[in-house]
Design a protein with these regions (language model features):
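Active-site-proximal alpha-helix that buttresses catalytic centers in soluble enzyme cores
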Residues: 1-224
Length: 224
């Protein structure tokens, strides 16, 4: 039997965020016939990733995170360490999803003269640096200046990002959402009162493809 593909997600109390997880599991299952697919939460839920891993003889954890913050560096690695050799983890999916962010941004309507990339933020500088690199690539794709604003744990904040873009002469701003699923963070974005806000990535073909390709790379014998 194929190794179980465990999609590692943050965890949420937001109804739409939970629905996203169910939809993502279904989409990945459809893209990888014959592969058992499960969700493993790293926070908030009663059963966390390290416990989920224990239920399977072999598993591949694919961290569905846009940056390698604490949960990727600590929780995922801890789940692997506690698995007794039954689980491995792949790199997180974030680096492959800039075009998905751009797609959602363009779907939000005509772009203004600049973009605010709204990101959750991390206590890990390396994770925030990944977000800044994403902003640079997004700017190249949409041919607009992109300023980054963090919602939690880091600076510049969303408000500071807007202020800086305004100071640079950009007043018609569109928000790109650096997140996979809806969550409580949306209230912080709405508080900006900007004209257009892009949806989070959601069930995007690039996300599904990134998850499946990482699983296949970790199980080459089964893919052959």
């Amino acid at each position: 039997m194929s190794a179980t593909l465990i999609i590692a997600l943050h965890g949420t109390r937001h109804r739409r965020g939970v629905e996203f997880a169910d939809e993502l599991r279904a989409a990945v299952s459809a893209a990888a016939p014959g592969v058992p697919v499960e969700i493993g939460w790293v926070d908030i839920h009663d059963e966390l990733l390290a416990e989920t891993v224990q239920r399977f003889e072999r598993s591949v954890i694919v961290p569905a995170f846009l940056a390698a913050g604490y949960h990727v560096d600590h929780d995922v690695e801890e789940a692997v360490a506690q698995s007794g050799g039954r689980a491995v983890a792949t790199p997180h999916v974030g680096p492959e999803l800039v075009r998905a962010i751009a797609d959602r941004l363009l779907a939000a309507g005509p772009l203004g003269d600049a973009v605010v990339l709204a990101a959750i933020g991390s206590s890990r500088p390396g994770a925030n640096a990944e977000v800044l690199a994403t902003a640079e690539r997004l700017s190249e794709l949409v041919e607009r200046p992109v300023g980054t604003g963090f919602i939690y744990a880091s600076q510049p904040t969303l408000a500071q990002a807007v202020e800086q873009l305004n100071a640079d002469g950009h007043h018609d701003l569109t928000v790109a959402t650096h997140a996979l699923a809806p969550g409580l963070y949306l209230d912080h974005i709405a508080a900006l009162g900007l004209r257009a806000v892009a949806e989070p990535i959601g069930i995007h073909p690039h996300l599904v493809s990134a998850i499946v390709s990482r699983y296949r790379a970790a199980t080459p014998a089964e893919a052959s």
